[in-house]
């Protein structure tokens, strides 16, 4: 939504709302869960400001800047949602590129700070990679790499997301990868898709 709203005032941004997406990919062997979008992306300073500060919410600041007519639901508006990733991951990497800017990678183990470095990334948007923790005697983190668990979490926490949420899956028998859409664009849910 941030990209769409910025495109209304920035004529350099060309946004086809029907091509915006959120994509998930899991790798059980490497214990990785990746969430990627082709949204607005973040600059180096935005990564530091929005992810490097607990309870700092760039989403909330964006939402507060809208007019009353611009009713919108924004994920992460309280600034602590992102940090819940460290409940299941021992390391989080965020790669992001904003239009017209360099791309950067933010990395943290959730314990003592973070690192940011410049990277090569041509596509605008953000990719978050969670390095899922190993199981312990009391916790089964494997479930966060199971398709049914991920699908249930998507439906529970992201039902209001306007854009499609897709997940790459691999058929264990054939090895073929497919892209399944869990939440389809629901035009009745959002008037912007009726244009």
Residue ranges of each PLM-predicted region?
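GHKL (Bergerat-fold) ATPase N-terminal catalytic module, capturing the glycine-rich phosphate-binding loop
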Residues: 1-144, 152
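ATP-binding catalytic core of ATPases
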Residues: 116-195
């Amino acid at each position: 939504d941030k990209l769409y709203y910025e495109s209304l005032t920035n004529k350099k941004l060309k946004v086809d709302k029907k091509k915006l997406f959120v994509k998930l990919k899991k790798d059980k062997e490497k214990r990785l869960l990746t969430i990627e979008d082709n949204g607005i992306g973040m600059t180096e300073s935005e990564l530091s400001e929005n992810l490097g500060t607990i309870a700092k919410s760039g989403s909330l600041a964006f939402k507060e800047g809208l007019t009353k007519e611009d009713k919108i639901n924004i994920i992460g508006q309280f600034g602590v949602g992102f940090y819940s990733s460290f409940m299941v991951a021992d390391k989080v990497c965020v790669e992001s590129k904003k239009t017209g800017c360099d791309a950067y990678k933010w990395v943290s183990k959730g314990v003592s700070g973070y690192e940011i470095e410049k990277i090569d990334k041509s596509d605008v948007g953000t990719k978050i990679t969670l390095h899922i923790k190993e199981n312990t005697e009391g916790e089964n983190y494997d479930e966060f790499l199971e398709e049914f668990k991920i699908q249930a979490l998507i439906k529970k926490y992201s039902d209001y997301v306007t854009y499609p949420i897709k997940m790459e899956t691999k058929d264990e028998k054939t090895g073929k990868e497919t892209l399944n859409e869990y939440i389809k664009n629901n035009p009745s849910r959002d008037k912007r898709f009726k244009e």
